[in-house]
Amino acid sequence: MIQGVIQKIAGPAVIAKGMLGARMYDICKVGEEGLVGEIIRLDGDTAFVQVYEDTSGLKVGEPVVSTGLPLAVELGPGMLNGIYDGIQRPLERIREKTGIYITRGVVVHALDREKKWAWTPMVKPGDEVRGGMVLGTVPEFSFTHKILVPPDVRGRVKEVKPAGEYTVEEPVVVLEDGTELKMYHTWPVRRARPVQRKLDPNTPFLTGMRILDVLFPVAMGGTAAIPGPFGSGKTVTQQSLAKWSNADVVVYVGCGERGNEMTDVLVEFPELTDPKTGGPLMHRTVLIANTSNMPVAAREASIYVGVTIAEYFRDQGFSVALMADSTSRWAEALREISSRLEEMPAEEGYPPYLAARLAAFYERAGKVITLGGEEGAVTIVGAVSPPGGDMSEPVTQSTLRIVGAFWRLDASLAFRRHFPAINWNGSYSLFTSALDPWYRENVAEDYPELRDAISELLQREAGLQEIVQLVGPDALQDAERLVIEVGRIIREDFLQQNAFHEVDAYCSMRKAYGIMKMILAFYKEAEAAIKRGVSIDEILQLPVVERIGRARYVSEEEFPAYFEEAMKEIQGAFKALA
């Protein structure tokens, strides 16, 4: 055991001397209270430690003890429906132990050591096992939780516990070399869990939000960023994704954001039902709360803890969504620690390795064949909070170069009460062409063409709006006025969505396709009518315009009949005009 003494304290950074033999990223117990810290730089026998708890009251000369182990998480049954702090300490158990405030130096296990789980073995004595293989299963809510061999373990099974109820601490499998395998194992958070190989992302991560699913889709196993200024709806968008996306498990990391936002999740999610299982939505969610009033250093750890938990569920063959809200606060934590270590700053005071750290985090997403031979995926959606909505700042620019989908939130849209306030002219997705075959097969053959037509109309409308602002709408011909009106219909009746409406909060691909088809059928017929000499005002008086506007509030069950009637009405209305 390596023990040194505190030489200097600078905010969350502690400099200790006499630490010869300690290693990078080892966990240390700092001071008399044993605060948790991590070595982030070594220089001779001097160690630079970032402390994950409040350092006020520490004194020079107090001991610093290296445990010789890296920051690791416990992975096993009991994580779902849990809420942890940034270094995987369960808040519920801390409250039982110390009350409503987190006492410094408190030690609690991440997984419940008392609870018994119904173990069903899947291996027998004599079997050869290796990392990632399934040893047995445990039911957890509506999931079958697979107990995995840790990735770096292999050997022959000597004995297996029979089916029954055991705690996570009891060995359930013993190998011939004496290795005892329990229902849980630990894994260092800074090391990506190994996989057999990565796959091309070719299935969409469906969110239930029309603008994202249709115009800017992200693939299962892809990465997306949601940058936007304050009040533009980043958190509500991420909470909608956590509620309605087609992921099996959601890991929600509240990194340096307000505590109320985590409270919202804790209040709302248990009341909502998971459309797949019918159980509470909280049963598929792991929350990591590292709010703005918690120590800065733990923000950096919380992102890694979240992605490691996501990789563990991926290794069981689940598709996992990781919501990081917000990566800007994480970058600010890097900046804070970097300045305390007196490192050379780069742009806006951020450390020069900011882009490398962001890339290393986002690269842990992906659709993979796991070590156990199953298919799993981690999709990462990171919110970015640029100060004052300035998209040219380093975190946004570094993220922009890494992610596959960029959903830009716009304050001017939010002020106009257009939600989700995603700017369709400033966002993009690199997954569109890779996902087109899936859409052709599972939605409709002409789906990509309809989507492109909608995009083109929105771009034409944006160009015409500039002319309107200069010379007014009267200078436009009827055909151009039609483009502006259809653009308005697309914006208000297709792109807008009410996250708090019981029907409109979620929209299936079939329904989105139906609404697109109705809008484009209306545009085609109206364009032909204008060529025949019908005035634009007559066209806009048609009751079918209102019918298209009501489509988004029609339930999924009633929509097919509604769609058929609307299409007939569009045909009939324009015949009557002729």
Swiss-Prot record:
Annotated keywords: ATP synthesis, ATP-binding, Hydrogen ion transport, Ion transport, Nucleotide-binding, Translocase, Transport
GO biological process terms held by the UniProt record: proton motive force-driven plasma membrane ATP synthesis
Short name of one Pfam family: ATP-synt_ab_N
GO CC terms of this entry: proton-transporting ATP synthase complex
Domain of life (superkingdom): Bacteria
InterPro entries xref list: ATP-synt_VA_C (IPR055190), ATP-synth_a_Xtn (IPR031686), ATP_synth_asu-like_sf (IPR023366), ATPase_a/bsu_AS (IPR020003), ATPase_F1/V1/A1_a/bsu_N (IPR004100), ATPase_F1/V1/A1_a/bsu_N_sf (IPR036121), ATPase_F1/V1/A1_a/bsu_nucl-bd (IPR000194), ATPase_F1/V1_b/a_C (IPR024034)
UniProt-annotated binding residues for ATP: G228, P229, F230, G231, S232, G233, K234, T235
Key word Kinase present: no
EC number: 7.1.2.2
Described purpose of this protein according to its UniProt entry: Produces ATP from ADP in the presence of a proton gradient across the membrane. The V-type alpha chain is a catalytic subunit.
Family: Belongs to the ATPase alpha/beta chains family.
PANTHER family membership: H(+)-TRANSPORTING TWO-SECTOR ATPASE, V-TYPE PROTON ATPASE CATALYTIC SUBUNIT A
Protein name per UniProt: V-type ATP synthase alpha chain
The species this protein was found in: Thermus thermophilus (strain ATCC BAA-163 / DSM 7039 / HB27)
Taxonomic placement: Bacteria, Thermotogati, Deinococcota, Deinococci, Thermales
This protein's encoding gene: atpA
